[in-house]
């Protein structure tokens, strides 16, 4: 589930609904049929400052960024109803955020990250990419920037894309928990080349499988 995605590369479900290609791939990986509720709001950019807004798989108009910022408050019921329906029908629903959960200039009206976790009563994990460098500063800074009500939704960190021996992290994860009160629940290895389309982009230079 991803409440809102921005991508030109939509996929079409069996009933003709458009959802983000990434959510379509994720559904197939989970062994379930992709459906509109898995990506209730899809933004398909038409220019640098405007997007076609697709709601529950159907186009609903083209809005500028400023117009969408105002309009998206009305999409909360759509998002929450879609998520509730999935939770009723599936044992586990994994919700993906977008970008950073601590973009403090965007928290007002954010319907895809921790405000969604708060509204739906979801425990949240913050995933940091150690391959990019600065993962501990990034995780600590994320929690430090969050208001108290959103910080309370964060139950743990996951460190992703580690190259080499996890023992090289030493006591850093424990130190991070002492500093901010959030445990590191897992460290995932770098898998090298993975033949899956990048999020929000379709590999157009690759022949179809």
PLM feature spans:
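Flexible phosphate-sensing "switch/lid" loops adjacent to ATP/NTP-binding sites
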Residues: 1-209
